[in-house]
Structures are given as C-alpha cells and as structure tokens.
C-alpha cells in the first residue's frame, strides 16, 4: 500500500501531461504530492526524510514549472534530488564513516562492513548515473521523451538496481536469513 501510494503522483503527472500539458501536469503533481504526504502522516504517523525532501522539491520546482510554464524546472528537480541523494550517501561514508545504507537497513539485515560500504557506493553511483542520464535526456531529447523517461525509465532503472542489490546481498546474509 505504501509503495503504491508513492507512485500515484507520478502516474497522475504522466496522465495529465499526456492530456493537457506540462503546466497542468505540474499542478496535478503538486496537489497529488501534498495529498500523498497527508495520507502518509495520517496512516503511518510519520513521513520519511527522503519523502519530505522529494515533497519539498516537487512543490518548489512544480510551482516554478506551473507558473512559468517551463518544464526545465521539473527537469532540474530530478537532477538536484539525485545529486543530493548521491552526496548524502558519499558524505555518510567518507565524512561520518558510517554508510547511510547500513543505518537505514542494518536493523533488518546483517552484513559485513565492507558490503555495506560497497552498497552505499553502488547506490551513490546509481544516483549519479540517474542524474547524468536525466541531464542528457532533458537537454538533447524532446519534452515528451523526458516525461516518459521520468515516469517510467527511472522506475525501471530503480527496479533493476534494487534487484541487483538483492542478488548481491543474498550471498552475504547469514544462512538462517537466506531462508526467510
């Protein structure tokens, strides 16, 4: 339910874009994101930091996109958010000597420290890759191609990265955790 709720604003953005254009899609995205945050708060009692960052970015850049009727603001949102996520992961590992991935998932799974470090770097690299692809597509492809990429390409890339992460991590899980 929680994961499905996260996709609703994106799906609504895509549909409204195809029907009406970027200004209306940005407005729909803002409204859906605000409702999503309210539902998360009411149903689960809290909103994760990542969701707060995304929500603030959506409202800020979505408002600029709607007001000026220019897609570039939402395109920069994607770039900035992925750069921020990569930077946070890198700072956690090199600045604080504690990979953020371990802090987020360490209660659920037990892994050797070197694996947490590799995962943290891999996800930082993934976010940098997404950022660079977003920059390329937003600069060299049509607005419609960018909307398709934002709506489906990034989701597919994230799914594949998550799948590879699971396969990689499985080898290092304690034997009793592998059977769960």
Curated annotation (Swiss-Prot):
Keywords: Cell inner membrane, Cell membrane, Membrane, Transmembrane, Transmembrane helix. The chain crosses the membrane at residues 11-31, 52-72, 76-96, 121-141, 149-169. The keyword Nucleotide-binding does not apply. Its main location: membrane. It is a multi-pass membrane protein. Belongs to the YciB family. This is Inner membrane-spanning protein YciB. It comes from Mannheimia succiniciproducens (strain KCTC 0769BP / MBEL55E).
């Amino acid at each position: 339910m929680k994961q499905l709720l996260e996709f609703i604003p994106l799906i609504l953005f895509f549909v409204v874009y195809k029907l009406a254009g970027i200004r209306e899609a940005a407005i729909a995205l803002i409204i859906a994101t605000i409702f999503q945050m309210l539902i998360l708060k009411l149903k689960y009692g809290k909103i994760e930091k990542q969701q707060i960052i995304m929500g603030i970015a959506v409202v800020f850049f979505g408002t600029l996109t709607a007001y000026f009727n220019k897609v570039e603001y939402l395109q920069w949102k994607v770039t900035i958010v992925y750069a921020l996520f990569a930077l946070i992961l890198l700072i956690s590992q090199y600045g604080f000597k504690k990979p953020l991935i371990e802090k987020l998932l360490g209660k659920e799974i037990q892994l050797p420290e070197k694996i947490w470090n590799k995962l943290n770097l891999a996800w930082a690299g993934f976010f940098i890759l997404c950022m660079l692809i977003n920059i390329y597509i937003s600069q060299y492809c049509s607005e419609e191609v960018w909307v398709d990429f934002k709506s489906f390409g990034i989701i597919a890339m994230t799914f594949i990265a998550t799948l590879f992460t699971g396969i990689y991590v499985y080898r290092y899980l304690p034997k009793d955790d592998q059977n769960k």
